[in-house]
């Protein structure tokens, strides 16, 4: 999987070097990105992070557009410095002039939401007694943290029920 993406990063750098007649330091490329973002350029670290799930699901467009988008951020930063806007004029010129691509700010990939597990906690209030806790909050309770109902001031207790959104 990474060999095609790394080859595209290299191709984008060569295009920029041919255009600007100078060399650019190559970034570290990582596939450690999750969630909604397809890619992120860390300017000061010269690091590109890509979302492997979105890459697998949208491979052709991802290689063409997303990789160039993130490389353009690093090139713009190295050419024009840290004071430029992330999707400003300089970045747009690189996207259009070097890569011949539309300077789209955001992707339109379908992002699958992961299912959230909720742990139901209860108090003694008759009308206000269900409190769905996240896994993180549930684990904090297991480590001794206490949560209280704002109405009756009783400690919330795990009911044993688990739901999935």
Curated annotation (Swiss-Prot):
Names of required cofactors: Zn(2+)
PROSITE patterns associated with the record: ZINC_PROTEASE (PS00142)
Cofactor binding comment, as recorded: Binds 1 zinc ion.
Disulfide bond sites: none
Subcellular location: Cytoplasm
GO BP annotations, alphabetical order: response to stress
Domain of life: Bacteria
Coiled-coil blocks: none
UniProt similarity note: Belongs to the SprT family.
NCBIfam families, A to Z: PRK04860.1
Gene: sprT
SprT-like domain: residues covered: 10-157
Descriptive protein name: Protein SprT
Residue sites binding Zn(2+) per the record: 69, 73
Alphabetical list of HAMAP family matching this protein: SprT
Active site positions, chain numbering: 70
GO (cellular component) term, any one: cytoplasm
A GO molecular function held by the record: zinc ion binding
Alphabetical UniProt keywords: Cytoplasm, Metal-binding, Zinc
